[in-house]
Amino acid sequence: MPGIWTRQPGTTVYTAFFVAFTLLRLPWLCVLYLFPSMRPNVCWTFRQSLSRTLFSYFGEYVATVELEPPPTLVPGNEKDKFVIIDPAKSDLYRDILLCDPAIRPGAVGAVWHTKPITHPGQHQSGQRVFFHLHGGAYVLGDGRDVGMRFTSSLLLRSCPGSAVFCPEYRLASAPGGRFPAAFQDAVTAYSFLVHELQIPPRDIILSGDSAGAHLAIALLRYANANPDVLPEPAALLLWSPWPDMIIGVEVADERPATHVDHVAPQLIAWTYREFLPRAETGVSRSDPYISPVTAPIPTEIPIWVQWGGAEILKPEINKFVRVQESSQSRYKGERRARVGTYEVPHAPHDILALAPIIGWKSEATDAVEEAIRFLDGCLLE
């Protein structure tokens, strides 16, 4: 339930407290982190340590005041790169997508981070289109230029000639955003590329960071289960995925990584409160669409997973990899699994999206380049 800090005058009071607390603590942190032994991780730089702590404070703040998301159907500065997608035909939405009668498919905003593809035939055969779902714990984030500039630039630089398409799915922090709202929007946006723009699935790379990776896994699972209405993409790239929502906030809070990673337990609690399906739907936390670690996807497409060595969710990510590897076939007689993994030593959660803020740009660049090499090895053989 919302607390007193989520409504006025409580929000203003708490905001003033947060600003004062942060400003007073900043000089002390600057002195403290001059000594490597006092940093969250002794392998981190001063910049990484200070940025991590300040970002963690911010995460606690937004989860406490429950910051309201901006509108998702307004073009804004993206102008002609922004598109509004109407829901697809009703037969596209089945089973889990209709578990809550109160949540129906709606219009979806999306942003092209290259020259927009606006009509069938404009896409060139062989041109990769990264269908990227942003992170933010299902309560924050967007696919706009400001938030996606670093991620999209890495993908475009590492894969010249490609395109990046970012849907603005409904957030659980807004009315009507509880599960399966974001899931419906992801299906709508993916169907738009395949059916409206007629981009061949073999040219679409499904990608997502953090909660966006969780959503990408759900989208692939749905396409795999419903090939008659939604074909699978060429590959799946997962960046610091959130593969298990069974784990309790208390358990996460007790992990040593909690005091190193920037993910605030309050943010996880906010997500659980606003995102998880209503009890009346009969969809539990252990459902594979909610917690992918509970069942593999019987797919043949390549899956690549990146995570940081200091992530709070590292055990769950490793479990997801093991579960998925157990069902993956081998390459045409080669002894090489279709699940690629890449751990960034000592890194915190989601450096793909947050590197400019928390100081991991070179490591994020290396990770993207490795992902593209993996794709090339799988798709160009």
Predicted features and spans:
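Catalytic nucleophile-loop/oxyanion-hole region of alpha/beta-hydrolase
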Residues: 147, 165-203, 360-362
